[in-house]
Amino acid sequence: MTIVLGIDPGSRITGYGVICKQGKILSYLASGCIRTKTNDFPNRLKRIYIDVNQVITQFKPLVFAIEQLFIAKNMNSALKLSQARSVAIVVAMNNNIPVFEYAARQVKKTLVGIGSADKHQVKHMVRTILNLSNNPQTDAADALAIAITHCYISENTNRISSKNLILARGRLR
């Protein structure tokens, strides 16, 4: 059993999603949004740190998956996003949880089959894959999508790695 925490970073709203992977079965554990209500940016970062740490303490994930940065037109927004993202990564590292990063296009392609999918399509697939009765909030759905992507990609990577190891051993005999 592997518990995966997915994070969709943001300086005002950070989404989180926690899922459990047992074999090929993915189960929903929790999701939500960390809303930073203050205009004081250092206090927003502090709120992200505290709340992500609480989620980690409660669910004890073995894996931390987060969205990679994308090139933004507004440099100030990109800097704030990178700082919020960095704070979340530091929380994971302080808890000795390995960090994996996924591009937004990769997440969309993994869940929907096309890298240019819209938020509604991603939300629908998250709801379908995790058998949810309602759509999660947008940022929480994105975080769950990142966690699901990690499960799918790591499963395929492990399968490929194992196959290569067997072939390599076969050649050595």
UniProtKB/Swiss-Prot annotation:
Cofactor: Mg(2+)
Active site (UniProt): 8, 67, 139
E.C. no: 3.1.21.10
Disulfide pairings: none
GO molecular function, one term: magnesium ion binding
Subcellular localization(s) per the UniProt record: Cytoplasm
Cited InterPro entries: RNaseH-like_sf, RNaseH_sf, X-over_junc_endoDNase_Mg_BS, X-over_junc_endoDNase_RuvC
GO BP: DNA recombination; DNA repair
Alphabetically ordered keywords of this record: Cytoplasm, DNA damage, DNA recombination, DNA repair, DNA-binding, Endonuclease, Hydrolase, Magnesium, Metal-binding, Nuclease
Binding site for Mg(2+) 1: 8, 139
Cofactor notes: Binds 2 Mg(2+) ion per subunit.
A GO-annotated cellular component: cytoplasm
Catalytic activity: Endonucleolytic cleavage at a junction such as a reciprocal single-stranded crossover between two homologous DNA duplexes (Holliday junction)
Residues holding Mg(2+) 2: 67
Main location as per UniProt: cytoplasm
Quaternary state and interactors: Homodimer which binds Holliday junction (HJ) DNA. The HJ becomes 2-fold symmetrical on binding to RuvC with unstacked arms; it has a different conformation from HJ DNA in complex with RuvA. In the full resolvosome a probable DNA-RuvA(4)-RuvB(12)-RuvC(2) complex forms which resolves the HJ.
Similarity annotation: Belongs to the RuvC family.
Protein function: The RuvA-RuvB-RuvC complex processes Holliday junction (HJ) DNA during genetic recombination and DNA repair. Endonuclease that resolves HJ intermediates. Cleaves cruciform DNA by making single-stranded nicks across the HJ at symmetrical positions within the homologous arms, yielding a 5'-phosphate and a 3'-hydroxyl group; requires a central core of homology in the junction. The consensus cleavage sequence is 5'-(A/T)TT(C/G)-3'. Cleavage occurs on the 3'-side of the TT dinucleotide at the point of strand exchange.
Protein name, as recorded: Crossover junction endodeoxyribonuclease RuvC
Organism of provenance: Baumannia cicadellinicola subsp. Homalodisca coagulata
Origin organism lineage: Bacteria, Pseudomonadati, Pseudomonadota, Gammaproteobacteria, Candidatus Palibaumannia
Gene name for this UniProt entry: ruvC
